[in-house]
Each structure stands twice: as structure tokens, then as C-alpha cells.
């Protein structure tokens, strides 16, 4: 099942955030934190709002002192997730770096699972436009909590990662950059949609992911619908953003004992600075990586390049 799996590594996240800065800096510059020490205390709130006739529930992680330029990250759960009482592995990064975090819950799909409508075969006929709903929810949250009206970013894992691709393909203007973890481009998106608006995009994916296969699943053996191999999906966005060249480097891992290797592919020179990054976790499985890398810190490092731009 494509769920946002909880790992023991989440319990060590505060430590991992602190020690990840050196490996991340080696690949892409130091992790950029916008908060002062006194602003790192956060507040949690669970709330809801009616959006397009749907009651949308969400959890907010807010800096103690919200500023008019406080950025927002929206985090989308995996298939069947959506328990707003659970702390995510992005919470500690928000606490450290001072951005606001919104964790919305998906609606119940035809199978009775909370999910995002990305066009899985079993979602056929489900009249929910999560692209529009999430953009409206984000705007509402920005206004309600006095956040930056321009610095909003989107990330998600698995089903939430697929929603990230769909958001990019639908030419949205709400999110300045998008990051997917173990997400996929379904074949219907790849062939049926014509993305036209460049957007900075990052994918983090394990090569041994047996749920969201690195090599794709065009025969639809897994039942999620036919989807493209990860390199082909990423290259579509590279072409969209008109990136001019690729830089590949191996990133030091947090725990070398498992034998995994992480390669960062950066596609640079994109229109208006819209670059595409791909973290290839060799040997990595279907997870929010906390052993090889601090995924939350890596995501924020990517997003922070596009603050107030």
C-alpha cells in the first residue's frame, strides 16, 4: 500500500537535521534557515475549512512569531494516510528553520481511503479536483495565519508525490517549487496533459522501491495505473523547464553502513532559474529517507533557493 510509512528514524529527526548540513552542503549549499533562535518554538493547530463543497481538515505547524514573510510548505500524505494527530518528519525541520507547515488530509476515495485524486483506475468517476482544492486551501491558510502571500511550496510522498507531478502538469501558479518523494508520473498525465509553465521540481526516489518502481510500470502490474520510469518522468520536466546541462555528484550518506549510495542529478540553466533535481538513492526502498539522508532538510534546502524570488 502506498502509505507514508513511519520510521524509527523520525524519532531521531532533530539530531539528523543538525548533522545533515555538511552532506547537504557538499551537494547543494548549506541548509538555509530563515528563523532566529527565539522564533524556533512552534505551535500546532488542527483546523478545517469548506473548499469547493468539501470539508478540508488540516494541521498547522506555526512559528511562535509569524512574520509577513513567513514561508509555507504544504505536505501531502501517502495513500490511506491523513491522520492529523501524527507528527511528520517535516515537523522538526519547520521548527528548526521557522517556516509554517500545513499538513492537509485527503478526502475519502471510492475505496474508502483518504487519498489525492491523481487518476488511479479505481478513482475513475471520483469528482474531486485536488489541484484546485489545494491551491484554494493554501491561499486560505496564507491569509488566515498572516503568512507570505508568495512563498508557498508543495511536497508529498507516494500518492502525495503523484499529486506533486499533477500539480506541475496542471500549470498551477500557487507553488513556487515542488518536491516529490517516491512519486510517479502516471501515463495518462504524460500523454494527455501539456504542461507549459516551468516550475522548479525535485524528485527523491529509491532504485529498489517495489511500490513506486524506479523502472516504471507500463503494464500496470501493480494496479495503480500505468506509470513512467522515474528518469523519463524527470526528463519531461527538464525539457519543460528548458534546462541546459546536468551536473551529477555523489552525496555523502548519513549512515554508510547499509551500503546505499546517493547520487544527486542537478539539471541547471532552466528558464527563470527553474532547475530540476533528482536524488537517486541506490538501494533505497519506498520510504521517507532518514537513514541515507535527511529528506526534510534536503527538501527545504531546495525550496529555500526560491524564497522571495
Predicted regions and their residues:
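Bacterial N-terminal signal peptides
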Residues: 9-18
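Cap/lid segment of the alpha/beta-hydrolase catalytic domain
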Residues: 105-129
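Short beta-strand/loop motif that positions the catalytic acidic residue
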Residues: 203-205
Amino acid at each position: 500500500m502506498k502509505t507514508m510509512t513511519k520510521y524509527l528514524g523520525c524519532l531521531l529527526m532533530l539530531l539528523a537535521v543538525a548533522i545533515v548540513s555538511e552532506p547537504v552542503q557538499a551537494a547543494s549549499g548549506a541548509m538555509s534557515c530563515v528563523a532566529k533562535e527565539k522564533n524556533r518554538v512552534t505551535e500546532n493547530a488542527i483546523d478545517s475549512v469548506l473548499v469547493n463543497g468539501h470539508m478540508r481538515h488540516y494541521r498547522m505547524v506555526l512559528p511562535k512569531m509569524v512574520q509577513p514573510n513567513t514561508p509555507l510548505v504544504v505536505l501531502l500524505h501517502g495513500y490511506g494516510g491523513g491522520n492529523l494527530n501524527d507528527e511528520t518528519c517535516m515537523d522538526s525541520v519547520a521548527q528548526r528553520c521557522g517556516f509554517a507547515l500545513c499538513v492537509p488530509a485527503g478526502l475519502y476515495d471510492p475505496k474508502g481511503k483518504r487519498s489525492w485524486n491523481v487518476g488511479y483506475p479505481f478513482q475513475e468517476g471520483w469528482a474531486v479536483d485536488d489541484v484546485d482544492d489545494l491551491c484554494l486551501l493554501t491561499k486560505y491558510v496564507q491569509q488566515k495565519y498572516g503568512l507570505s502571500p508568495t512563498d508557498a511550496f508543495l511536497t508529498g510522498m507516494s500518492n502525495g508525490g503523484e499529486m506533486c507531478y499533477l500539480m506541475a502538469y496542471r500549470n498551477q501558479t500557487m507553488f513556487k517549487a515542488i518536491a516529490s518523494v517516491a512519486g510517479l508520473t502516471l501515463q495518462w498525465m504524460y500523454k494527455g496533459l501539456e504542461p507549459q509553465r516551468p516550475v522548479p521540481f525535485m524528485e527523491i526516489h529509491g532504485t529498489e522501491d517495489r511500490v513506486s518502481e524506479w523502472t516504471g510500470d507500463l503494464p500496470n502490474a501493480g494496479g495503480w495505473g500505468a506509470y513512467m520510469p522515474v528518469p523519463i518522468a524527470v526528463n519531461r520536466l527538464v525539457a519543460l523547464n528548458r534546462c541546459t546541462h546536468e551536473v551529477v555528484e555523489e552525496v555523502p550518506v548519513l549512515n554508510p553502513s547499509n551500503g546505499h549510495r546517493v547520487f544527486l542529478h542537478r539539471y541547471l540553466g532552466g528558464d527563470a532559474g527553474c532547475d530540476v533535481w533528482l536524488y537517486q538513492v541506490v538501494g533505497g526502498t519506498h520510504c521517507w529517507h532518514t537513514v541515507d539522508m535527511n529528506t526534510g532538510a534536503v527538501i527545504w534546502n531546495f525550496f529555500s533557493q526560491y524564497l522571495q524570488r
